Amino acid sequence: MKLHELKSAPKSRNHKAKVVGRGHGSGLGKTSGRGQKGQKARKSGRTRPGFEGGQTPLYRRLPKFGFQTVGFKKQTLSVSLDIIAKLNETTIDRELLVKHGIISSKTNEPIKVIGNKIDKKIHLKINKISEGAKKAIQSAGGSIELI
């Protein structure tokens, strides 16, 4: 494919820009479809979002609430059992997940395995695991080592 062979998507070029203020014969001359005077006829003639005509707006009438401690929240990396099942490995740990590109090598966050279906026997060395994933691995004959 070359630059001169590129084509637009069908119907993507049908919209014509509205040309206004070019004489009364165009149908959109003089006031350009904005009517006569008034706030909406001016440039920037709209109110800001949340403005209620001078009345105290709802977002100021309601009390502030909540606080998020984003910097202190413990983050975990979730890895699904479906992804682990696709790996042709029997022992799975952080290094293996990094090697296969499932998690980044730069993160140091704990890994949590989630899911509830797996049919092959694996040995996991991870930080956390959900109850469903734990039952699924143990019923398939696998083992879990929490580190």
UniProtKB/Swiss-Prot annotation:
Compositionally biased residues, Gly residues: 22-36
Organism: Mycoplasmoides gallisepticum (strain R(low / passage 15 / clone 2)) (Mycoplasma gallisepticum)
Keyword rRNA-binding attributed: yes
NCBIfam families: rplO_bact
Family from the record: Belongs to the universal ribosomal protein uL15 family.
Gene Ontology biological process terms, A to Z: translation
Annotated protein name in UniProt: Large ribosomal subunit protein uL15
Subunit structure: Part of the 50S ribosomal subunit.
Gene3D superfamilies with a match to the protein in the record: 3.100.10.10
Feature: compositional bias, Basic residues: 10-21, 37-46
UniProt GO MF annotations: rRNA binding; structural constituent of ribosome
Chain positions covered by the region annotation Disordered: 1-57
Any single GO CC term annotated in Swiss-Prot or TrEMBL for this entry: cytosolic large ribosomal subunit
Cross-referenced HAMAP family: Ribosomal_uL15 (MF_01341)
Function as written in the Swiss-Prot or TrEMBL entry: Binds to the 23S rRNA.
The keyword Secreted is annotated on this UniProt entry: no
Keywords: Ribonucleoprotein, Ribosomal protein, RNA-binding, rRNA-binding
